Amino acid sequence: MWTEKQKKDAYEILLLQQQGLLEAEDNWLANLANSSALLNETLPETVFAGYYLFDGNELILGPFQGRVSCTRIKMGKGVCGESAEKQVTLIVDDVKKHENYISCDSAAQSEIVVPMVKEGHLIGVLDIDCGVTKGY
């Protein structure tokens, strides 16, 4: 497991790499695809890194890296639906202890979900699952 300093340093490097990818391309689909690949390859123990896009009713699976996953998530359901509905970042140290958890991959032990909001409107969420508890 990482120390807090190692985690901070890795996140800073990851942010610089992501910024470089975004500067080189303006297509949202290509950017989401490359972003999920970067996250999957950079963050240790990652079992899923991807995006769920909001279609006005529910979250639909978008570009991701990992195993086959849930394709649709209702608002308020699971960590992704909860994060999307509340428009807040959620960090779950142990998914087995989270009451509202939806298991899309049995290898996931911890999870972080970050809502994507533009001008007050939900676009979707970034979902990253880790194969160990307290991964984030």
Language model region names:
Residues M1-E4, D129-Y136:
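Regulatory loop-to-helix N-cap segments in sensory/regulatory domains
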Residues M1-G62:
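Intrinsically disordered, low-complexity terminal regulatory regions
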Residues G20-A24, Y101, G131:
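General structural signal for alpha-helix termini and helix-helix connectors
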Residues G124-V125:
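Short glycine-/small-residue motifs
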Residues S110-V117:
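A short, aliphatic-rich beta-strand micro-motif
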Residues T46, F54-C104:
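Regulatory sensory and allosteric helical modules in signal-transduction proteins
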